[in-house]
C-alpha cells in the first residue's frame, strides 16, 4: 500500500466518530510496520481517548520503529486527555505522516515541532484536502468561535418545496430522507423558524438507531411556540433552545402600574408572556434572548451566543424566509440541495429561498466546490458558500 492509501484508511476510520466527537475534530490513525498495518484507531467520542492513543492501544505487536498515519496533527496540550505527542514518542514511532495541520491555537504546529525535536521524522500534507474537508466544522469553529451552518432543503426540479396548497410530504424518496437523518446525526444542532413549527409541528430529531439527536434551535421572535407542540412535549428528552427577541423579555418584565384601561390590557398581556415563559422553562425549554434586527432575530447575535455554548455546527432546516435571512446575514457556510424529478408548478407554491432576493445576477450568492450525488431517483447537490 502507498502512503496515500494508508491515509485514506485513516480518513475512513475518522469518519466513524462522526456525530460523537463535537466539539473535538474527527481523527483517525493507522500504524504500519514492515508494510503491515499493526494498529488502528479513531477518536470515538468526546472526552475519550484520541485516535493516536487508540491506535497504539490496539497494536498487535510492538510499535517500536513503526510509522504512524494520522489525519490531524497530534495534539501537544493537556485537555480531557493528555498530549498525543507524548504517547507517540514513548511508543518509539520513527515517522509520522500528517494530513491536516491543527489550527487550534493550543497546537498550531506545536505537535509537529515536538515530534521533530525528539528525532521523529514528520511528513505533512498527505491527502491534505481530504483531511481538511473531514473537519471543515472544527476548523471553522476553532478559528471563529461561531457555528458552521449548513442549509438544507428538498425541492422539485421547478424549485418548489411544497405545492400551492402547502403539502410537502414527500418531495424526495427514502434514500434522500435517510441521508438527511445522517446529517441530523452529524451536526451538533438543528435550526428551524417558528413558521415551520406552526405549519408542520415537527420533532426535528435523528431517527437513526444509535444516532445522536441534535440540539433543537427554534427562531421565534415573539414566542409563538405552542405549548402543545411536539417540540415542547419532548423538550425534557431532547435539548431545545428557543431564540426570542430581547424586546419580548423587556415587555414581559414590564411592571408599570396601569393608568388606563389600555395600560391594564397591556399589563395583562405582559403577565401572559411571563406565564408562557415559565411554562416553557418548566417543560425543559431554554429561552435564549437575542437582539432583534428589522423585526426578526438578529442571526449574527444568535450565532455569537450559540458559539459561547460550544455549539460548533448547525443544520438549518428553515423555510424560505429564514433561509433568505440566513444568507443575507452571511452565516451560511454550506448548502445541501436535494432535488426530486418532479414538477409542482404554481406561482404561489413556496420556494426554498424567499424574502426580497437579489436585485441583480451580479449580486447572487455564489457557490463552489460542488458535488453531485444520486440518491435513488433524487439528486443531492452539496456546495460551499463562496460569498454572500
PLM regions and their residue ranges:
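N-terminal glycine-rich anion-binding loops that anchor highly charged ligand groups
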Residues: 21-34
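Zn2+-dependent cytidine deaminase-like catalytic core
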Residues: 31-130, 215, 327
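Short acidic/polar alpha-helix capping motifs at helix-coil junctions
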Residues: 18-21, 46-51, 75-79, 142-145, ...
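Short capping loops/turns at secondary-structure boundaries
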Residues: 104, 108, 124-127, 142-146, ...
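Proteins enriched for Cys/Gly/acidic motifs involved in redox and nucleic-acid/cofactor modification
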Residues: 20-23, 112, 126-154
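A broad detector of short, well-ordered amphipathic alpha-helices
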Residues: 8, 12-15, 39, 50-53, ...
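Generic structural signal for helix capping and beta-alpha/helix-loop junctions
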Residues: 105-106, 132, 323, 345
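Enzymes that bind and transform nitrogen-containing heteroaromatic metabolites
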Residues: 3-8, 13-17, 22-24, 80, ...
